């Protein structure tokens, strides 16, 4: 560690000790002597050396008066959806986003076998689903909404002309495990148990086969595309994370075996700025990787008490990682400290979870969502305080194996072992 880093770390420790001292002083000042003494004992602060003081209250009051002056400007997406999840600034945030329990099924599409993969485009206008039958469907969101709403003829006169499924793609030999839309081009990328990653140009109506194939040595389980669209982070049934250069098809891995996971990988996600990406594994760990050097920079060990970690997802601002595990618990981790800030509990209380399932935020990051396997219902929590929200019956006749929320609208899709994918939407909201 550099000398500057050591000095900064010492300053942080001093500031934290001062913060605890101010809290204890404030508790004494407000008449909460017992609480003050208990906190002093926990943080090993000599209670007798702390005098009652209202200083903390005054500092907070001054800080709140000037807080808006230091907030960063919002980008275009944040102006539309709100700033997203940021526990540093928010105390009582207001949201216009609908509770997940208010969503309704707008369309159902069927495959010939279990459905276990889905993805939205960045603008939320298209969604793709993938199945164990090795087929992929691309569906138009406006057309799905028009099919389920008699009044939609006026709102979407062009949408009702055609069928919601605008493309069906066949070029894999085994289960489709993951799907990603390219952020800039009309390209859909698919991963499969046949060890291949394929790229489809869906701008051509006649194209059913891939124009490019990357062949791995192991079954592909998950992938995440770099925001630039130039690179692909890929996980397989093995413990080693791959980074593919899409144009050259070159594959890169971390050269240090001790930094790798020790079990099969289950999930990977880039942060929005692509400086880092996160992986989940059956070894029970979550790892954070440098997006340039491919080195592991952080490990969250046994995040779900040793249970398999099923999914990872970054918040929009990159400060937090949302993880889900086979223990049916969803957790919010602070990247800067490596601490679990919030545990979202209550799913899996009826029966033990057997299959991997993904947790997700809604489009505004006001809610955390996770499927309860035993009841085939959707559990939802307030993202900031883990308060339980109403359940939503998902209407599937088998486990929900994958879910993905639209990045910009109140819509999500559920994929189930009952061969179906359900498109959910909440109408008449901002």
Outline where the language-model segments fall.
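Per-blade loop-tip surfaces of WD-repeat and WD-like beta-propellers in eukaryotic adaptors/scaffolds
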Residues: 94-103, 138-166, 173, 185, ...
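Beta-strand-rich domains and repeat architectures in extracellular enzymes and scaffolds
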Residues: 108-134
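Loop/turn segments within WD40 beta-propeller blades
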Residues: 118-124, 179-185, 223-230, 235, ...
